[in-house]
Amino acid sequence: MEIVSRAWESVDWDRIQTRVEAEVTALGQRQDDSEIRKTRLVEESNAYRGRTNKDSRKVAIPLIKAFQSEFDGLLARSTAAENALIDICKSIVSLPDPKSLLKGAEAWKNDAEKTQKAVEEREELKRQLIKVNNELEDLRGKDVKVRKLKDKLAKLESEQDIFIENAVNEVEKKAEQELNDRLTELIAEKEKMKEQNEILEKNMDSLESKNKDIQRKLEIAKQTVEQKDGLENEQLSIAMKDLADAKHKIVFLEERVSQLENEAEKVNESKKAGNIEDIAALGSVLVQKDDVIQQLTNDIKRHEASHVEELAKWKLAVSAVEKKNKTLIGELNELKNQLESRNDYEAIKNELRLLREIEFGDSAEANAESIERLGETVETLDRLLAEKNRRLQNENASLRVANDGFKGRNEEQEAELTVLKEKSERNDRLIAQLEADLASAVQDIGIPERMGTNEMLKDAPAPTISDASLVPILTSQRNRLHERVTSLEEAISLEKTKQLSVQNEIERVREENIRLCERIRFLQSPGGQQQANVEAGLGNDFRNGNRNKKVSLHDKTTLNMGRAILATPKSRTVFFSYLLILHALIMLVLYKFAFDQSVVRDAETECEYKFHQHMLDNHKQ
């Protein structure tokens, strides 16, 4: 009613009156124009009748009649419309003003609504009173039953309490039993891990000892090969010198035999021309010469036989030495290949040291200073990795629990968001429906259609809606709902980002855990020389230091000299040069000694030969 009254108040009656007057004036003007057009049409018809003959007029008469009838119909229609419009305007002007009635009707409507509400409340109170009376009568009749039910309820509550206590005790017992079982399992696993660690330490010690034995055998093999090579070379040089001496002796003896043969020929020649007195002396000399020649030939044969035997022996010895040298060279090449295949020991050692320093900090320094600073024994690499693995597993479990909590919260928020979205959509639909209803109500406000004034009120201004209407309230409520939905969406997006970050952290921890497990498996794999090298170089420095204290003085000196020689390429080169020079000096000294002995023997034989020649030439003896 308020809207209808406001619509009637917003009607501009003066503008409507002015428009009606203007429309009446326009009707008179249009009527005058139609009379002028009618007279002109009559004139044109007369002119057409005068210009044309009878036959042509007969042809055009139906058209003219149809046109005339249409014109008369339009004229009658226009006259009827104008008369109806004038009557409607008169009736509108003669209508009374309904504003006071509308205001009174609004008050009457409010009073009627209040009266209706009061009547409804009165009826509702009557019904409630009747219902309460009935219930009161029922309750009075059921007092005994209520008491029985109360007693039964108390009994059931006591039984329920007893049942709950028993169930709680059973659950506590089960939980305690499961906890004890879990503790026993954990203790067993801990003992098993300790046994495995002890086994691994024993394996590491055995691998270290094997590595040292292999290195010591390699050094011994190198020394034996070098010594055998030197001895074989020396023996070969001595044999060659002896062979050369034997050749010189053979040549000397052949020359001596040739000289004796010449002397014998000379003696035979002198025998023919000599005196008879010298026959006895020459016979004795010839006998002596024959004996000497026989002795020399025997010596030559004996020397040749011994030379052949010694040459065969030396050939066999040389072939055996060559075979042994080949086998030693093969072993040496195999050991060199093994060393070349494991030449990344220093790199792995440095990388693992850096890894320990980066991953574990001060706990990775295995020396006396770090022990004094930390106040405890430094743990080995596998134990540190196992501890870190356990720590990462605990962090992974906590992150998994947090992730489950985030997932639960996320699901709850998503469910709440869906509910809020449904509410928002329902509110949007209600708001749209209310807006459509309000728009239709506003459009329907005005003069009813039965009065026939809709076309006249087309240009009227739209009725204004009061600020006290429901539209601002609904729009503000919709805005609040939109803001709440946006805030919830932002919170959900934030939770999703947190969940993604937690999942990424879990993946990173899992990858790091897998990498650490692979490193532990690599370090715990049996039969690997690199493990022995790594653990010997990194994990057991303190134990090696204690073991080195028990080594004797000459072993320490030998080990230190070996380390000093094999430490750098320069030291190895210097040591090799020193051995080569020393070997050359020894060979030169031996060669000089053998040469001096051969020269002395040659001088003795030459002196003996000259003395014998002198005795023959001068003293005939």
Curated annotation (Swiss-Prot):
The record gives the membrane topology as: Single-pass type IV membrane protein
One Gene Ontology cellular component: Golgi membrane
Key words of the record: Coiled coil, Golgi apparatus, Membrane, Transmembrane, Transmembrane helix, Transport
Q: Which residues form the signal peptide?
A: none
* First-listed, main subcellular location of the protein, grouped into a coarse class: Golgi
Record topology, Lumenal segments: 596-621
Question: Which regions of this chain are Cytoplasmic-facing, per the record's topological domains?
Answer: 1-574
Record-annotated membrane-spanning stretches: 575-595
Coiled-coil spans in chain: 101-445, 473-525
Which GO-annotated molecular functions does the record name?
A: DNA-binding transcription factor activity, RNA polymerase II-specific; RNA polymerase II transcription regulatory region sequence-specific DNA binding
Q: List the disulfide bonds.
A: none
Q: Name one GO biological process term.
A: intra-Golgi vesicle-mediated transport
- Where does the UniProt annotation locate this protein? Golgi apparatus membrane
A family per Pfam = CASP_C
Question: Does the UniProt entry include the keyword Transmembrane helix?
Answer: yes
What is the stated purpose of this protein?
May be involved in intra-Golgi retrograde transport.
The UniProt entry's sequence similarity note says: Belongs to the CASP family.
Question: Which protein is depicted?
Answer: Protein CASP
Organism, as annotated: Caenorhabditis elegans
Q: What is the lineage of its organism?
A: Eukaryota, Metazoa, Ecdysozoa, Nematoda, Chromadorea
